[in-house]
């Protein structure tokens, strides 16, 4: 049979791949994990976190920057920061910290996480804490408290001109500062300029008026930029990056303390088996552009900071569902109903049209057909109908299996996996709490190596109970 799902994948992509393969029984493996065994043990719907992938991604980026620094004989240092907002879970942050990284925060409560990490001896007071975001007093006061208690590398990134006054009043020791440069948005965005940061044309004057001359109290150490579009090889990205590089060169001539550029994050992750992105090329170009501009301006090369969130944690997670029903609504539309909801578990699919890498776990030798995946809520937008590489979804057929002589085919549902879902989905959906149509949060399983180097799995959170929801709603 040539029209099986296996043949479709192998004709469309290079398969198997490093992180996806079929085992001898025909079931999909994810980073070598036997997903079917985990389904048999825990059931579906299931959220799966594979923690070793986090360290692999961090060290991959570090190695590529090291290669670029050697290629260009770059004289600064590289500092990898993890954005806690991508996934705040302790098991994620602590896994990332095992790889000698720094942290980026975005809200007041992030600072409470920093305090807990210090109490657990997961960090010391020399770690860089890059504090982003528009800051209310609850945030600035916590930042000040960190600095006042001896955290020497806390860098509040000024989002507006008034923010500095808050630190002047509350910080008792000399401290470092950064400035976020307001980037121009890409042409298709609803706004011309980012709401975050200070306008580039105002920064030199702001430095002279408010920072210069106070170096014994605070020093401007970092320029920061982040582009919503991410790090892409196009005119828009290089134009915005060169603006901050040129601004650094101008400021450096009057601000000798300035020594770092933070280019933010934005590395894409794999959302299709056909994903192609030359990370090393982009890093080489970024490093080369910074060096070239600094040489031309005759200023020292800055240290380079990055803030990778999705790149760090995104590829470490998967959501696994069962197809619990099939509905044919007309001659062209065939629905596979899953045992959960896209709106409540993968909100980016609904909110911004995000596409994740989707593959069936089983039935790869069945014929395939075009389908639409439907969630369990009553909302008409709870569906998934296209992939990253094509505006359709193809999955193995499940019809006529009752006529099969294979007893497994009769009883085993089709399992569908959405992969590389580790960034932002729980943060946007909320963990527990009240969900649309009271759809419960799925169980969450973690896979990691134990102290003896053996791969183990355990349940971090059970499926949400009705009682937990009723209590929040005031019925219990």
Q: What residue ranges belong to the model's regions?
A:
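N-terminal capping/small domains of soluble enzymes
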Residues: 1-138, 370-372, 391-427, 432, ...
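Conserved, mostly hydrophobic/aromatic
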Residues: 54, 85, 107, 179, ...
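A structural motif corresponding to the C-terminal end of an alpha-helix
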Residues: 68-75, 206-220, 250-257, 285-302, ...
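Active-site-proximal beta-alpha core segment in soluble small-molecule metabolic enzymes
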Residues: 78-260, 269
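Glycine-rich beta-strand-to-loop/alpha-helix junction loops that act as flexible
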Residues: 227-228, 261-271, 306-311
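Short glycine/threonine-rich loop-to-helix capping motif typified by GTGT followed
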Residues: 232-239, 270-282, 313-325, 430
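Catalytic cores of soluble, metal-dependent hydrolases
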Residues: 238-261, 272-303, 328
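Charged (often Lys/Glu-rich) extended helix/loop segments that serve as interaction or gating elements
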Residues: 285-287, 291, 295, 299-476
């Amino acid at each position: 049979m040539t029209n099986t799902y296996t043949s479709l994948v192998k004709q469309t992509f290079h398969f198997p791949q490093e992180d996806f393969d079929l085992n001898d029984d025909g079931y999909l493996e994810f980073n070598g994990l036997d997903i079917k065994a985990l389904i048999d043990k825990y059931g579906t719907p299931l959220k799966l976190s594979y923690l070793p992938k986090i360290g692999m991604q961090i060290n991959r980026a570090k190695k590529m920057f090291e290669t670029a620094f050697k290629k260009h004989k770059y004289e600064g240092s590289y500092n990898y920061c993890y954005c806690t907002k991508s996934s705040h879970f302790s098991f994620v942050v602590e896994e990332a910290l095992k790889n000698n990284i720094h942290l980026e925060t975005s809200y007041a409560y992030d600072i409470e996480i920093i305090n807990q990490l210090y109490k657990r001896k997961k960090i010391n007071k020399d770690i860089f804490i890059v504090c982003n975001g528009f800051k209310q007093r609850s945030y600035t006061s916590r930042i000040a408290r960190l600095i006042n208690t001896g955290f020497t590398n806390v860098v509040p990134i000024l989002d507006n001109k008034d923010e500095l006054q808050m630190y002047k009043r509350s910080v008792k020791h000399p401290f470092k500062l950064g400035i976020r440069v307001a980037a121009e948005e890409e042409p298709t965005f609803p706004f011309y300029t980012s709401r975050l940061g200070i306008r580039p044309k105002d920064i030199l004057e702001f430095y002279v008026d408010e920072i210069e001359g106070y170096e014994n109290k605070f020093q401007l150490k970092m320029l920061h930029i982040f582009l919503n579009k991410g790090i892409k090889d196009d005119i828009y990205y290089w134009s915005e990056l060169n603006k901050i590089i040129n601004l650094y060169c101008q400021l450096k001539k009057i601000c000798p303390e300035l020594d770092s550029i933070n280019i933010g994050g934005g590395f894409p992750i794999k959302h299709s088996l056909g994903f192609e992105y030359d990370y090393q090329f982009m890093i080489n170009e970024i490093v080369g552009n910074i060096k070239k501009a600094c040489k031309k301006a005759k200023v020292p090369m800055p240290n380079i900071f990055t803030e990778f969130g999705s790149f760090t944690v995104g590829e470490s997670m998967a959501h696994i569902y069962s197809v619990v029903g099939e509905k044919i609504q007309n001659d062209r539309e065939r629905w596979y109903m899953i045992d959960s909801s896209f709106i409540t578990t993968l909100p980016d699919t609904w909110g911004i049209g995000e596409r994740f890498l989707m593959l069936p776990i089983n039935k790869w030798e069945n014929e395939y057909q075009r389908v639409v995946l439907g969630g369990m809520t009553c909302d008409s937008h709870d569906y998934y109908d296209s992939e990253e590489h094509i505006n359709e979804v193809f999955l193995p057929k499940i019809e006529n299996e009752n006529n099969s002589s294979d007893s497994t085919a009769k009883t085993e549902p089709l399992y569908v996996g959405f992969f590389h879902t580790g960034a932002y989905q729980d943060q946007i959906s909320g963990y527990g709490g009240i969900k649309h149509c009271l759809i419960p949060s799925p169980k969450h399983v973690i896979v990691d190596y134990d102290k003896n180097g053996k791969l183990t799995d355990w349940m971090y959170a059970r499926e949400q109970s009705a009682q937990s929801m009723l209590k929040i709603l005031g019925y219990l």
